[in-house]
Amino acid sequence: MSLIEFPLLDQTSSNSVISTTLKDLSNWSRLSSLWPLLYGTSCCFIEFASLIGSRFDFDRYGLVPRSSPRQADLILTAGTVTMKMAPSLVRLYEQMPEPKYVIAMGACTITGGMFSTDSYSTVRGVDKLIPVDVYLPGCPPKPEAVIDALTKLRKKISREIVEDRTLSQKKNRCFTTSHKLYVRRSTNTGTYEQELLYQSPSTLDISSETFFKSKSPVSSYKLVN
């Protein structure tokens, strides 16, 4: 190569060479190829299934659904989580390789939904079992909301550092896999203490003189006024 061709090389190299860091390259590759593990237990999963069709086409985001947690880096929980399902959900999360992310989809997953008031077997929030990165409220959320949640997760991935995320999860998170059920007496049975409702005749027949003698001395002027 002659010396005359060097200026031409300098002009074309600025458009063909990209300078970046290994962290940015890793984040870019991860946010562009999320492989979700679909943990659907209720009607919210039907809304997510509509993303597979041609109308929304979630393949354009690089999503490839996986059936094995060892090949997934995103778990999407949709629907009610019961006490019996809690250990299996935690095990699936632990089998996923780092870095891994969680999207809680629907009111039943986030707070227990309508089953959280009277049900004895519903987990009141999946974040009591595994750490959640994006909360997606709704009953059920629309497919457009799911796309918005995925976009927010992609933005979060593009700004993070893998080492800092792993250390923060080890220090600040505490997972609970065992749920104990304590049977207590109900407060709405309709039976009450009879002593509080009905006083005995001995307490009702107390004269006024005896009553005032047991109390502190009060003048008649104070009683009248």
Swiss-Prot record:
Gene Ontology BP annotations: aerobic respiration; electron transport coupled proton transport; photosynthesis, light reaction
Cross-referenced InterPro entries: NADH_UbQ_OxRdtase-like_20kDa, NADH_UQ_OxRdtase_20Kd_su
MF term (GO), any: NADH dehydrogenase (ubiquinone) activity
Cofactor: [4Fe-4S] cluster
Keyword NADP recorded: yes
Catalytic activity: a plastoquinone + NADH + (n+1) H(+)(in) = a plastoquinol + NAD(+) + n H(+)(out); a plastoquinone + NADPH + (n+1) H(+)(in) = a plastoquinol + NADP(+) + n H(+)(out)
Keyword S-adenosyl-L-methionine found: no
Cross-referenced Pfam families: Oxidored_q6 (PF01058)
Top-rank taxon: Eukaryota
Residues annotated to bind [4Fe-4S] cluster: C43, C44, C108, C139
Cellular component per GO, a single term: respiratory chain complex I
Annotated localization: Plastid, Chloroplast thylakoid membrane
Keyword terms, alphabetized: 4Fe-4S, Chloroplast, Iron, Iron-sulfur, Membrane, Metal-binding, NAD, NADP, Plastid, Plastoquinone, Quinone, Thylakoid, Translocase, Transport
Function noted in UniProt: NDH shuttles electrons from NAD(P)H:plastoquinone, via FMN and iron-sulfur (Fe-S) centers, to quinones in the photosynthetic chain and possibly in a chloroplast respiratory chain. The immediate electron acceptor for the enzyme in this species is believed to be plastoquinone. Couples the redox reaction to proton translocation, and thus conserves the redox energy in a proton gradient.
NCBIfam families: nuoB_fam, PRK06411.1
UniProt-recorded name of the protein: NAD(P)H-quinone oxidoreductase subunit K, chloroplastic
Annotated source species: Oryza sativa subsp. indica (Rice)
Gene that produces this protein: ndhK
